[in-house]
Amino acid sequence: MTTPNLLPNAAADLARNGDANGLSALLKGGLAVDARDAKGNTLLMLASYHGRAEVVKLLLKSGATVDLRNDKGQTPLGGVAFKGYVEIANLLLDAGADPVADQGGSTPADFATLAGKTEILALLQARRDNAAKPTRWYSKLIGWVRK
């Protein structure tokens, strides 16, 4: 995949290794927050998959797109579900990550099940159930329509 904002190896290493200060300096210097490596992984994907919560917080605060997929069609939440990083899963979900995004025929819950990450599986189920609940205005609208 050819991308105009190819991620420098040094930035990818900072994300993988959890160097929030070094990465912050690069972002302030103009590094695109959604730049990708040769496999389509963003900084957010790399930091998430390697369990680097502080870097994930920095990237989300800097405007990283939470559901960008890599070349395999995977999102950061899918990788986190497989690894079992509950704190990072919460950060991604709070930032709007889709808890049921199809990733090549699998969902984050499928990855959590495969890896035996029951705490992540419960979190994804709860978030999915909460997302499916009607909002207050929707409930009022349904009540009005039924009258």
Descriptions of predicted regions:
Residues 1-29, 38, 130-147:
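Intrinsically disordered, low-complexity regulatory segments in ankyrin-centric signaling systems
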Residues 22, 54-55, 87-88, 119-120:
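Conserved ankyrin/ankyrin-like repeat signature
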